[in-house]
Amino acid sequence: MKKTDTLPTTLSALIQEYSIAEGIQMAEQQVRENPAKALCRHSLFQLLCVAGDWSRALHQLQLCARMEANYTQEARLYRELVRCEMFRHTVFQGEQRPGFLLPQPVWVESLLAALACHDDTGEVDKHRNTALEAITDTGGQWNGGAFDWASDSDSRLGPVLELVTGGVYIWLPFSQIRSLESPQPTRLTDLLWKPVNITLVNGDTHGAWLFTRYSGSESASDALRLCRETAWQDGPGETTVRALGQKVWLTSHGDISLLDMAHCTFHAQENDGA
C-alpha cells in the first residue's frame, strides 16, 4: 500500500489518494480496530457499493443499523437501491422488464425488444431502428442552458431516464417529464444513486433516485467506477452503443452529466408518444 496506512479523514480524500481496492483494505482495517464504531463500517459500506460488492456492502450497513438506530432508515433505503441495481442488470440482459410511472410510448417496447434479442444483430438493429423512427424530439432546459433534443449516450436507452421510486426500477421517457430537481453529490454513494424530485407532465410528483453510473461499471476501471469519465463500446449491430462510467445525456447543445445536473425542464406534452 502506498503513502500512509492511516485512513484519510474523508472518503473524498481517500479516493483521490488511493485505489478503491486499497481504500477497502484500509477501511477494513479501521473496522477491525474499531468493531463497535458504526461510522467506520459506514465508510466500508460506501466503498463496497462503488466496487459492486453488494452483499458485503449491505451486511456492513445492517450492522450499522444494529449499532445505531439512526442508520435503520438508510439501511432500508439502500437495500431497495441495491436490489434495483441488480434487477437493472437483468433488464439490460433482456431477461426482465422495467416498471413505468405512466403508460409507455410504443417505441419503448421496441427498445426492450432490442435488448431481448441479445447478440442477434439483425433483430437488434431492426427493433432499435423502429424505436428511433417513432421517437419525437423533446426539448428543454438544464442548469440554465437550452436544448432541442436529448438522449442518453447509451443507445440502448435513448430518451429514457432510469430511476428508482417506491422500491421499483423505472424507465421514464423524457416526453413524460416536466421537471427534475437534484442536489449536487455530497457522498460517495451519490456516484451510483442521486436523489431527485420529479414532476411528470400530468402534474404528479415523485421523490426518487437517479442512476448516475452506467450498469456494469462496477467491473470496470477505478476511473469509470468513480464516475471520473465515460467510455463507450460499439456493438453488437450498427445501432448499439454501450456506455460505462459517469452517466451522460447527449443534447443538441452539448452533453449533460447527471452528476452535475441540478435542474432540468422538458417541453413535453402529456400525450407525447403514447
Regions found by a protein language model. Give the residues of each.
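Short coil turns that delineate tetratricopeptide repeat
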Residues: 35, 69-70
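Structural register within alpha-helical repeat arrays
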Residues: 10, 43-44, 79, 106, ...
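TPR alpha-solenoid repeat register
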Residues: 40, 74-75
